[in-house]
C-alpha cells in the first residue's frame, strides 16, 4: 500500500503536530510540500483535500482528512490505538479531556506568542510585545494547572503516554525557538514531563524536521 501523504509545510506547527502522531504510531507516510507563495493551498487540487484551503491535509488512499487533531487521532487509531486508550472508558475520557485542554488552553495561550515572535517578523511585521506579555500570563496560569496535574501522574491523562501528550510537541518545540522557553523553569514537573517526551525517537525526529536548513 502506498504511504499516506501529509500535505503542508514543516514550518506549520499544525503539520508537525500530525507528524508527531504519525511518527509515534509508526505510520508509513510522506510530507508533500504546499507552495503558499503560489497560493497552491487555494488550488482546486488542494481544495479536494481540504475544502477550507488550509493545511495540513492527509491522504490515505481514497480518504482525505483535514484538521490536525483529527489527523492525529486517525494515525493513532490506525497504527497505535493504545495512544487513545479506547479499551478503557475512564482512561479514554481523560485522554479526550487533555486533548481538549491542549487545544483550548495551552495552545490557545501559546499561539499568539508564536505568531508575534516567529511569524509576524517573517511576514515583514513587528512583534507586538503587549500581546506577547498578555499571553505569557495566560500561559503561566495554564502551566500552574499542568504542574498540579503532573505531580499526580507521569503523563497528562495518567501514568501512560497518550496522544494528549504528543499533541503538545510541535507548539512546545516552537516555544523553544523563542526567547520565552524559560517560562517552563518555574514548573519542575512540567519540565520533567517535557524532558521525557524529548527522549522519544518520534519527538526527536520531528524536532530535527523543524530545524531550519543551514
Swiss-Prot record:
Domain GST C-terminal as annotated: residue spans: 88-214
Highest taxon of the lineage: Eukaryota
Entry similarity comment: Belongs to the GST superfamily. Phi family.
Catalytic activity: RX + glutathione = an S-substituted glutathione + a halide anion + H(+)
Annotated Gene Ontology cellular component terms: cytoplasm; protein-containing complex
Protein name: Glutathione S-transferase 1
Biological process terms in GO annotation: glutathione metabolic process; response to herbicide; response to hydrogen peroxide; response to reactive oxygen species; response to salicylic acid; response to xenobiotic stimulus
Organism of this sequence: Zea mays (Maize)
Coiled-coil annotated spans: none
Keywords noted in UniProt: Transferase
Gene responsible for this protein: GST1
Native organism taxonomy: Eukaryota, Viridiplantae, Streptophyta, Embryophyta, Tracheophyta
Distribution of this protein across tissues and organs: Expressed in the stem and leaves, lower levels are seen in the pollen and endosperm.
Amino acid at each position: 500500500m502506498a504511504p499516506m501523504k501529509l500535505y503542508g509545510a514543516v514550518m506549520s506547527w499544525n503539520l508537525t503536530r500530525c507528524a508527531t502522531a504519525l511518527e509515534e504510531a509508526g505510520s508509513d507516510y510522506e510530507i508533500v510540500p504546499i507552495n503558499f507563495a503560489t497560493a497552491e493551498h487555494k488550488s482546486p487540487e488542494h481544495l479536494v483535500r481540504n475544502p477550507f484551503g488550509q493545511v495540513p491535509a492527509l491522504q490515505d488512499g481514497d480518504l482525505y482528512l483535514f484538521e490536525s487533531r483529527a489527523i492525529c487521532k486517525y494515525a493513532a487509531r490506525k497504527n497505535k490505538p493504545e495512544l487513545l486508550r479506547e479499551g478503557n472508558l475512564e482512561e479514554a475520557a481523560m485522554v479526550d479531556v487533555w486533548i481538549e485542554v491542549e487545544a483550548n488552553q495551552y495552545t490557545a495561550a501559546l499561539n499568539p506568542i508564536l505568531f508575534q515572535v516567529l511569524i509576524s517578523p517573517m511576514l515583514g511585521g513587528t512583534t507586538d510585545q503587549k500581546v506577547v506579555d498578555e499571553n505569557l500570563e495566560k500561559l503561566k496560569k495554564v502551566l500552574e494547572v499542568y504542574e498540579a496535574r503532573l505531580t499526580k501522574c507521569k503523563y497528562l491523562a495518567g501514568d501512560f503516554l497518550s496522544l494528549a501528550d504528543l499533541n503538545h510537541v510541535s507548539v512546545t518545540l516552537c516555544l523553544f525557538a523563542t526567547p520565552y522557553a524559560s517560562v517552563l523553569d518555574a514548573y519542575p514537573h512540567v519540565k520533567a514531563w517535557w524532558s521525557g517526551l524529548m527522549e522519544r525517537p518520534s519527538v526527536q525526529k520531528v524536532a530535527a524536521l523543524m530545524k531550519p536548513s543551514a
